[in-house]
Amino acid sequence: MDEKLIIKKFIIRKLYRKRMWLHKHTNIHNLPKGLSNELRVSREIKSAIDELLKEQILLSKPTHYGLEISLNPKKVKEIEELVN
């Protein structure tokens, strides 16, 4: 499987499992935690997160302490396809 796809699925599953929808969010720096060291240090993480934001699967909320990320409830079907 492609590294970027593995990272995307991991991030989506993590947020889905913790029910991070719309107003419940987490810091962008917490997303790669739990990945293997190989994938965590790769440059694919940043591009995978950027792609998910562009596809509007992830929503971003800028705060004074950093960027917060949550799942988009309007994209539930696409998110569930990635999770399963």
Language model: regions and residue ranges:
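Short beta-strand-to-loop capping motifs
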Residues: 37, 71-73
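Short amphipathic alpha-helical interaction segments
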Residues: 38-54
